[in-house]
């Protein structure tokens, strides 16, 4: 499961 922090990194 991808962490929310990783999602922010994509942004």
Swiss-Prot record:
A Pfam family annotated for this UniProt entry: Tachykinin
**What is one cellular component GO term in this UniProt entry?**
extracellular region
Compartments annotated for it: namely:
Secreted
Check the record and name the InterPro entries matching this protein. Answer: Tachy_Neuro_lke_CS (IPR013055), Tachykinin_dom (IPR008215)
Q: Which residues carry this modification: Methionine amide?
A: 11
PROSITE patterns the UniProt entry points to: TACHYKININ
Please give the start and end residues of each transmembrane region: none
Please tell me in which tissues this protein is expressed: Expressed by the skin glands.
Please verify whether the record's keywords include Secreted: yes
Modified residue annotations for Pyrrolidone carboxylic acid: 1
Q: Which GO terms describe its biological process?
A: defense response; neuropeptide signaling pathway; tachykinin receptor signaling pathway
User: Where does the protein principally reside?
Assistant: secreted
Query: What UniProt keywords apply to this chain's record, in alphabetical order?
Result: Amidation, Amphibian defense peptide, Neuropeptide, Pyrrolidone carboxylic acid, Secreted
Concerning its family, UniProt says: Belongs to the tachykinin family.
Q: What does this protein do?
A: Tachykinins are active peptides which excite neurons, evoke behavioral responses, are potent vasodilators and secretagogues, and contract (directly or indirectly) many smooth muscles.
Protein name per the record: Kassinin-like peptide K-III
């Amino acid at each position: 499961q991808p962490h929310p922090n990783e999602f922010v990194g994509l942004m």
